[in-house]
Curated annotation (Swiss-Prot):
Cofactor: binding comment: Binds 1 divalent metal cation per subunit. Has the highest activity with Co(2+) and Mn(2+), but can also use Zn(2+), Fe(2+) and Mg(2+).
Species of origin: Escherichia coli
InterPro entries: Aldolase/citrate-lyase_domain (IPR005000), HKHD_aldolase_ent (IPR023701), HpaI (IPR012689), HpcH-HpaI_aldolase (IPR050251), Pyrv/PenolPyrv_kinase-like_dom (IPR015813), Pyrv_kinase-like_dom_sf (IPR040442)
Active site: 45
Phylogenetic placement of the source organism: Bacteria, Pseudomonadati, Pseudomonadota, Gammaproteobacteria, Enterobacterales
Note: The aldol addition reaction proceeds via a rapid equilibrium random order mechanism.
Keyword annotations of the record: Aromatic hydrocarbons catabolism, Cobalt, Iron, Lyase, Magnesium, Manganese, Metal-binding, Zinc
Regulation of protein activity: Competitively inhibited by oxalate.
Transition state stabilizer, annotated site positions: 70
Binding site for a divalent metal cation: 149, 175
Recorded name of the encoding gene: hpcH
Catalysed reactions, as listed in the record: 4-hydroxy-2-oxoheptanedioate = succinate semialdehyde + pyruvate
Protein name per Swiss-Prot or TrEMBL: 4-hydroxy-2-oxo-heptane-1,7-dioate aldolase
Gene3D superfamilies, alphabetized: Phosphoenolpyruvate-binding domains (3.20.20.60)
C-alpha cells in the first residue's frame, strides 16, 4: 500500500517517466518493464475511462514502474472512482488557483479531511477490505500533483504552493505555450523562461516540480534546475516515429510529419 512514488519525491529522488496514450493494458505492461520510474495513464487526451485505467493499473502492478493517473478534469466523482480502482497518484489538469488545488486534495481524502466517499468493500484499492486499517491509512498515501498550464495559474503559483496536501506541481508546456501566444512552440524563449522560473520556485517551496518534454537536452536542463518527476516521451509518438523510420528505410513514402510538442 505504500506509495513509493510519493516517497521518492519527498526524498528528492528524480523520477523519469513515460506518457501512456495507447489506452492498452498490453502495451502498458510492455512499457512497465522498460525501466521507467513512473508511467502516466492519460485520461484527459487519450481514450481512457475507469475500466481501461483499471486494466492498465493491473498490468503495471507486478513491475517496479509506478502508475500516475491523469483524470479528464478536477472532478471529485471521477477522482473517487479512479481512487477506488487503485490509483494512489493523481495528476490533476488545468488547476488555476489555490481553491482548485484544495478541491483536488479534498477529493482524495476521506472525511473529515476531505470528501472521498467510503466504499472500500467494493474497492480494489482496499483489496476489498483485506488491507487492515485501509480507511485510516489511505489519506497519507495519496499523492496529489496539480497541473499549471496558463498564465493565470503561473500568477497564482505561490498560493497553489501553499496548499497543504499538494505534493507536486506539473508544468504543462503545450497548453502554457498556447496560452502565452506561442501555440506549438514550447521552446520559445519566453515560454522557456517561464518554465524554468516555475521549476525553481516549486522546488524552493519544498514541493516537487514536474514536466513532460521529449527533447533530451531540455529534460536534462529541467532536472538540473530541480525537476523531480520528468516524463521524457510518449508511447504514441515513439511507436509512430519508429514505424515511419522503419518503413522509410525500405523506401516507403511516409506522410511528412511536422515536429510536435512531444
Amino acid at each position: 500500500m505504500e506509495n513509493s512514488f510519493k516517497a521518492a519525491l519527498k526524498a528528492g529522488r528524480p523520477q523519469i517517466g513515460l506518457w501512456l496514450g495507447l489506452s492498452s493494458s498490453y502495451s502498458a505492461e510492455l512499457l512497465a518493464g522498460a525501466g521507467f520510474d513512473w508511467l502516466l495513464i492519460d485520461g484527459e487526451h487519450a481514450p481512457n475511462n475507469v475500466q481501461t485505467v483499471l486494466t492498465q493499473l493491473q498490468a503495471i502492478a507486478p513491475y517496479p514502474s509506478q502508475p500516475v493517473v491523469r483524470p479528464s478534469w478536477n472532478d471529485p466523482v471521477q477522482i473517487k472512482q479512479l481512487l477506488d480502482v487503485g490509483t494512489q497518484t493523481l495528476l490533476v489538469p488545468m488547476v488555476q488557483n489555490a481553491d482548485e488545488a484544495r478541491e483536488a486534495v479534498r477529493a482524495t481524502r476521506y472525511p473529515p479531511a476531505g470528501i472521498r466517499g467510503v466504499g472500500s468493500a467494493l474497492a480494489r484499492a482496499s483489496r476489498w477490505n483485506r488491507i487492515p486499517d485501509y480507511l485510516q491509512k489511505a489519506n497519507d498515501q495519496m499523492c496529489v500533483l496539480v497541473q499549471i498550464e496558463t498564465r493565470e495559474a503561473m500568477k497564482n503559483l505561490p498560493q497553489i504552493l501553499d496548499v497543504e496536501g499538494v505534493d507536486g506541481v506539473f508544468i504543462g508546456p503545450a497548453d502554457l505555450s498556447a496560452d502565452m501566444g506561442y501555440a506549438g512552440n514550447p521552446q520559445h524563449p519566453e515560454v522557456q523562461a517561464a518554465i524554468e522560473q516555475a521549476i525553481v520556485q516549486i522546488r524552493e517551496s519544498g514541493k516537487a516540480p514536474g514536466i513532460l518534454i521529449a527533447n533530451e537536452q531540455l529534460a536534462k536542463r529541467y532536472l538540473e534546475l530541480g525537476a523531480l518527476f520528468v516524463a521524457v516521451g510518449v508511447d504514441t509518438t515513439l511507436l509512430a516515429r519508429a514505424a515511419e523510420a522503419l518503413a522509410a528505410r525500405f523506401g516507403a513514402q511516409a506522410t511528412a510529419v511536422k515536429p510536435g510538442v512531444y
